[in-house]
Each structure stands twice: as C-alpha cells, then as structure tokens.
C-alpha cells in the first residue's frame, strides 16, 4: 500500500465496543487500502469534572498551536545553523532513536515525564512549562550564535566588492609603503582601468612634493587598478582633492602592522568561537527537537482524550487511531469514515451530513466537523 509522503496524519477516536478489538477491526476493514492505521495508545487519564474538561479543551488547543510554532521555529533555525549541511536536517529530526513517523505510529505515553497520577490540568501545565523553556532557551542560544555569525559576516563583507570599498589588508604588505618617516607617507589610489595611462603620466604633477617614480601597481580587479604613491605628508590633502578631480580616488588607509594583525586575529578568534559553539548547539537543537516533538504528540493525545470524553461520555471507552492516508486517497478515506460513523450524530434532527447542515456549529467558528473526534497532524516541518 502506498502511503502519503506529505507527513499528514489523522488522529481520530470512536466509541469503543463490547469486544476489545471490535472498533479497531471495523475501522481497518472499512478503510481498506485508503490508509495505514496504527493504534493511538492513550492511557487511562484522570478525567476530572465536565467544567474542567471544557476549559481544558480550549487550553489544549492553544498549547497545541504554541508547540507547533516553537517546533517550526526550532527546525527553521536548525536548518540555518547547518548551513552547507542542510541536507542533514532530516536525519537530525529524531526523538531518541526514533524518527517522527515511528514515534507517532508507535506512540507510547512517557510516564516518567508526564505521570499518570497527575490531573489533566497538571499534565498540560507540565507540558506548557516545557515548551516555554525550550522557546526561551532557543531565543538565547540563537541570539548568541547569530551575533557571532553576523560579526564574521560583517568582516567577510569587507573583503568583497570593488577596490573602492573593500578591505585592503590582504592586498598590501609592508614593502609597499614608506614607513616610520617623519615627512613622507605612502597613499593608496584607486584608478579606473581606462585611465591607467593618464595616471602614470600625471600622478607626479597632481600636487607639489610627490616623489617621482614612486607609483607602483599593486593589483587590478574589475574596472579598477590599485596603485601606491609616496609624497610629503603636508600635501596629502591637496593631492587627494586634485586626484578626485581627475577621477582618481585616494583610499583612507594607513598601513599599520599591529592593526592589520589585530583584525586578522579578531577574525580567527570569532571563527574559532563559532566552531567551538557549533557542535554543542547542534546537539542542543537535536535533543530539544526530540523533547518538544514528544511533548507535542502528548498534547495531541490529551486533546483526543478530552474530546472523546466530552463527546462520548463516561465511563471512558473509546478507540483512538493514527491514520496515515494513502497517496491521493484522502477524499475516499473521508467518505469511508463518514459512512462508518455517521450514526454517531444521530438525533431528532437527523445526522449532520455536511457542516452546512449545522448553522449552530458554523456560528461557533467550527471549520471542520466530523461525527468522530478528529485532529490533523502534519509532521512536515521543513516546508511552510
């Protein structure tokens, strides 16, 4: 049987029947080749009062939305951190040693994290705190790592672009300059390639006190060439102005070995710190994806339990299932489920065939209504 590749699952529950597996067997017979079904093993939880269940239904809906939002945020950031290793994201989205599909279809309640002796309200609060903690930690860790990345990116941006703007540190060396002179200074000039001959003919006349023969070509990139020229310090401003009038741009650059070395050292430090933080961050993202995904599926289990009790009443007796629609079979599957469970909505007014048959439900903002408890689960977090 071919299954859907969209990561979509339907979490449903229907009333239990006399035989332990009667409801389950009936579901499997009816859905046939339209889906792959797994039991959603939700344990006996503390029911509480009807008022508590109604309030909890709304709380769990909000918690569900919040958990999914944090998961998507974490996965998106995980993908960004992996950078050129983005293809490895899927293998890191695991819960312990299980992939998402296995965790969902072979779900087992984690009693150590979410003790069954606790009330539904307390369980939802435990999960809520867990989600908030992961969300807050993600903000802190992403801010710290992003600051490093941004500082490195800022440094790297200076090494690209045209000779008019880029950092010159890697293009020059001490031998290109007259250093430690009381009177002389070497400046760097950006010359349009089409004006190179003009520069070589005119540079010594752009102001007085330019050292003849001191112009030296350092490099050429794109539409510009980079030259040095040596002149007396007291005429530098005059030289800059005259050069600009001739479309020769004097870069604001003074060669200082210590400053250049410090810049290179700073980048090396940032790169080393980024590499130092990378592995622990990947590990944290992987572990906490597993934590929040597990919490998310437990929220779904709580929602199925609460809605089943509200809809089917006491004593608690329902069959929950994880249904994976086969590719292209969603419509047919929905029809089969409708035929199988339409009787659950039997009333004096007759069963609800479509949502339009119930203005009351539509007025409450219900967008999807089925005669059985239904929640959609989409585990494709890599696509929005």
UniProtKB/Swiss-Prot annotation:
Q: Where in the cell is it found?
A: Cytoplasm; Membrane
SUPFAM superfamilies (alphabetical): Vacuolar ATP synthase subunit C
Q: Which UniProt keywords apply?
A: Cytoplasm, Developmental protein, Hydrogen ion transport, Ion transport, Membrane, Transport
Disrupted gene: phenotype observed: Worms display embryonic lethality. When vha-11 is silenced in adults, they are able to produce eggs but egg numbers gradually decrease and worms become sterile after 24 hours. This sterility continues for about 4 days and then viable eggs are produced again.
A single GO molecular-function term is:
proton transmembrane transporter activity
Q: Pfam families in the record, alphabetically?
A: V-ATPase_C (PF03223)
One GO biological process term is: ovulation
Q: Show the disulfide pairing.
A: none
Gene Ontology CC terms, in alphabetical order? intracellular organelle; vacuolar proton-transporting V-type ATPase complex; vacuolar proton-transporting V-type ATPase, V1 domain
Topological category with respect to the lipid bilayer: Peripheral membrane protein
InterPro entries named in the record: ATPase_V1-cplx_csu (IPR004907), Vac_ATP_synth_c_sf (IPR036132)
Q: What is the annotated tissue distribution of the protein whose record heads this document?
A: Expressed ubiquitously; higher levels are found in gastrointestinal and hypodermal cells, as well as H-shaped excretory cell.
Span-the-membrane segments of this chain are none
Family, similarity comment? Belongs to the V-ATPase C subunit family.
* Function, in words: Subunit of the V1 complex of vacuolar(H+)-ATPase (V-ATPase), a multisubunit enzyme composed of a peripheral complex (V1) that hydrolyzes ATP and a membrane integral complex (V0) that translocates protons. V-ATPase is responsible for acidifying and maintaining the pH of intracellular compartments and in some cell types, is targeted to the plasma membrane, where it is responsible for acidifying the extracellular environment. Subunit C is necessary for the assembly of the catalytic sector of the enzyme and is likely to have a specific function in its catalytic activity.
Relate the assembly described in the record. Answer: V-ATPase is a heteromultimeric enzyme made up of two complexes: the ATP-hydrolytic V1 complex and the proton translocation V0 complex. The V1 complex consists of three catalytic AB heterodimers that form a heterohexamer, three peripheral stalks each consisting of EG heterodimers, one central rotor including subunits D and F, and the regulatory subunits C and H. The proton translocation complex V0 consists of the proton transport subunit a, a ring of proteolipid subunits c9c'', rotary subunit d, subunits e and f, and the accessory subunits vah-19/Ac45 and vah-20/PRR.
Reproduce the miscellaneous comment text.
Vha-11 and vha-3 are transcribed on a dicistronic transcript where vha-3 is the upstream transcript and vha-11 the downstream.
Q: Which PANTHER family match?
A: V-TYPE PROTON ATPASE SUBUNIT C (PTHR10137:SF0)
Name the UniProt record assigns to this protein: V-type proton ATPase subunit C
Q: What organism, scientifically named, is this protein from?
A: Caenorhabditis elegans
Q: Write the gene name.
A: vha-11
